[in-house]
Amino acid sequence: MPIVVSDYKAPSWCPGGHLQTVLPAKLMPRPKVSYRREKVEMPDGDFMLWDWVEPEVKDVTAPILVHFHGLEGSSRSHYAEALMASCVERGWRGVVAHFRSCGGEMNRLPRAYFAGDSADCEWVLKTVHRRYPTADLRAVGVSLGANQLAKFLGLSLIHI
């Protein structure tokens, strides 16, 4: 693989990739997001915590964005709040589906989530679709959540 030479120079006040990653997350204003929490019972006897945002004017056909967070992320992660605020601005519903034992409450079963596990991802998407069959369903994942979503979509014959 060839080495790509770049003439990019980091600003003197913000050298290095670590600082360039951390500063925006800490210094940028965060949108105010109000969630409605739902504890959803799962077929295996466990539960998931879902944090919903909804526009003031509710349209049953409005798109729904399902967000799968990163490792130990939650609906309070800066990226989740920004994404859910954007949903509300567009008139969409949005839901952050917390993986097991994320979202501030330990689960009942001794089952954890991991990057290669797409079963819960599949269950979430199918459950949301059953509840809102006329809504356009969309999904996004960040980091670990993106891996689970990509695995599910790659193995699935379902068009999402």
In which residue ranges do the predicted regions lie?
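Short, surface-exposed "cap/lid" segments of acyl-processing enzymes
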Residues: P55-G103
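N-terminal cap/lid segment of alpha/beta-hydrolase-fold proteins
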Residues: L23-V57
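Short coil/turn segments at secondary-structure boundaries
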Residues: W52, Y79-A80, N107-P110
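N-terminal presequences and immediately downstream first alpha-helices
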Residues: M1-M28
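Catalytic nucleophile-loop/oxyanion-hole region of alpha/beta-hydrolase
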Residues: S86, C102-R138
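Conserved small/polar residues in nucleotide/adenosyl-binding loops
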Residues: I158-I160
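Active-site signature of alpha/beta-hydrolase-fold catalytic machinery across serine-
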Residues: A82, K151-L155
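Glycine-rich nucleophile elbow surrounding the catalytic serine of serine-hydrolase chemistry
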Residues: G141-K151
